[in-house]
């Protein structure tokens, strides 16, 4: 009996080692598929925030709206691969929540790998919503203090990954995003992943989106219904064009 018990414990340990981090024992996310190759496996740090709705209510109306957004975006790309900037005109428009829900919707394609990159180095939100560590992250890679493998985290979905912003002080953000290292980072991400979503600062608040035009030449503009005024949206679109970033469309959010 002792040998059987030891064998069972060994089998359970092997299964746990293969289980994607972020997925509790005996629990599967509705959109989950078999895990593909990843950079690192890390212990789970807890479930993501409830306003990232797809893992919690995959059959709900809001989840379906994010899938419709996903399908509309994918129709605009001949190849099923893209690198997309997700931004907003003003703060508090639901930009990061939209970015993460879109990422979970994309991750329902079991044959594709998706990564969310938090490039809002001034006010990052991705790590807080996904309950992952805030650092190291993008800032550390741009300083050459870490590699992409060091900062890439698993999520509740086996083929969805996240890279937090890391820690940066305001005066160095421009220099970090201006660094040629950013070009290498983007090239590596495009090679490793099918869908790259870059969460950026609000375009009318911070000047960083201009630098991020090197990372993604197309953008989704998030607009809060009955809050964001039309002149603000028009100005945001003009700023995207000035940075050589093509707006692919608007995503309307509401409370």
Predicted features along the sequence, with ranges:
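Long, basic/Gly/Ser/Thr-rich N-terminal segments
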Residues: 1-41
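P-loop/Walker-type NTP enzyme "switch/lid" segment
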Residues: 40-67, 71, 75-78, 89-93, ...
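Conserved beta-strand/loop subsegment of P-loop NTPase cores
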Residues: 49, 141, 163, 216-224, ...
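Aromatic pocket-lining residues of Rossmann-like dinucleotide-binding sites
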Residues: 106
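Pre-Walker A (Motif I) flank of P-loop NTPase domains
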Residues: 80-84
């Amino acid at each position: 009996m002792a040998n059987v018990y030891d064998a069972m414990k060994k089998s359970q340990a092997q299964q746990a080692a293969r289980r994607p981090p972020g997925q509790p024992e005996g629990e599967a996310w509705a959109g989950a598929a078999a895990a593909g190759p990843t950079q690192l496996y890390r212990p789970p740090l807890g479930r993501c925030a409830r306003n990232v709705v797809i893992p919690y209510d995959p059959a709900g109306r809001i989840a379906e709206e994010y899938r419709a957004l996903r399908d509309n975006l994918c129709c605009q790309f001949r190849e099923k691969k893209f690198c997309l900037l997700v931004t907003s005109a003003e703060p508090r428009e639901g930009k990061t929540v939209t970015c993460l829900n879109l990422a979970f919707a994309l991750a329902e394609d079991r044959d594709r790998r998706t990564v969310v990159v938090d490039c809002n180095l001034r006010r990052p939100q991705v790590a807080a919503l996904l309950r992952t560590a805030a650092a190291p992250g993008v800032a550390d890679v741009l300083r050459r203090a870490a590699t992409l493998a060091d900062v890439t985290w698993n999520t509740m979905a086996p083929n969805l990954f996240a890279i937090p912003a890391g820690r940066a002080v305001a005066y160095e953000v421009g220099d970090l995003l201006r660094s040629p290292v950013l070009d290498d980072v983007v090239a590596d991400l495009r090679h490793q992943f099918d869908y790259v979503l870059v969460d950026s600062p609000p375009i009318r608040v911070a000047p960083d989106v201009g630098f991020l035009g090197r990372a993604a030449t197309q953008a989704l503009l998030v607009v809060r219904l009955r809050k964001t005024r039309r002149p603000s949206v028009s100005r945001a679109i003009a700023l995207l064009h000035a940075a050589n970033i093509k707006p692919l469309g608007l995503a309307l959010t509401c409370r």
